[in-house]
Amino acid sequence: MLPISYTNLNSSRITRDGTASSASRYRRLIPEYFRRIFHYPQMDIEYTFWIMFYLCFNPSRVYRVTSWHKQTKNQWARDDPAFAVILVFFMAIASMSYAITFHFLSFLNVIKVMFWAVFVDFITVGLLIATIGWWVTNKFLRVSVHNHSVDQSVEWLYAFDIHCNSFFPLFIILYVVQFFLLPILLSNSLFAAILSNTLYIIGFSYYYYVTFLGYNALPFLQHTVVFLYPIGILFALYIVSVVMGKNLTVSIINFYFGFQL
């Protein structure tokens, strides 16, 4: 058994360093997270669908469970990639459905639409947003700690979890609901423009709201209300788009498929 003096010394060092042990544990978590992507039996599919359901109807409950996860596994981030994997699968199916609907039927065109939706809209933009959120929260929003307290920090993988959680309701609204409303949304009318733009403001406002809940669940962060500020900008843009008669669904379809509706 190690001497008491050594244990206390080591404990003090970790306390002064703040995140020494957590950083080491986090470095081990990243390879494990990606390794489990290729091991379906290790994924908790039932729990993932539970999260997806409550993200749409009671997202605050999801982050209460996140707090319990911290207590049991001593990390905020999920160690199970099932959520991201299932969401990528859903997005691939949805983007393929759009490609078929708009007669983008060649194999390369379908792959192009799927690639753009999954690897640009979700993954690349998500990595960027998660990194910005991770940097901003650790740099500006952490609560000052006392000299003998452990200095906690936001895990990058948790920031990416927040993006995944926030993106799922947006996916439901702007990929699924919008798809079934296309006959209405693509009509040349003011009602179609208002309905389309309303879907977009609801989807992106919900994204920022769930993002706020994710960071607000961390007890060592303060002023997390800043993640709600973009919603005000969205409402201003919404009013401008309605006044101008801009239909965002038409604009997005034109961008993705390269033709004018």
Swiss-Prot record:
It is found in: Membrane. InterPro entries: UNC-50. The chain crosses the membrane at residues 37-57, 82-102, 113-133, 166-186, 190-210, 225-245. It comes from Dictyostelium discoideum (Social amoeba). It is a multi-pass membrane protein. Keywords: Membrane, Transmembrane, Transmembrane helix. PANTHER family: PROTEIN UNC-50 HOMOLOG (PTHR12841:SF6). Belongs to the unc-50 family. Its main location: membrane. It holds the Pfam family UNC-50. One of its GO terms (cellular component) is Golgi membrane. This is Protein unc-50 homolog.
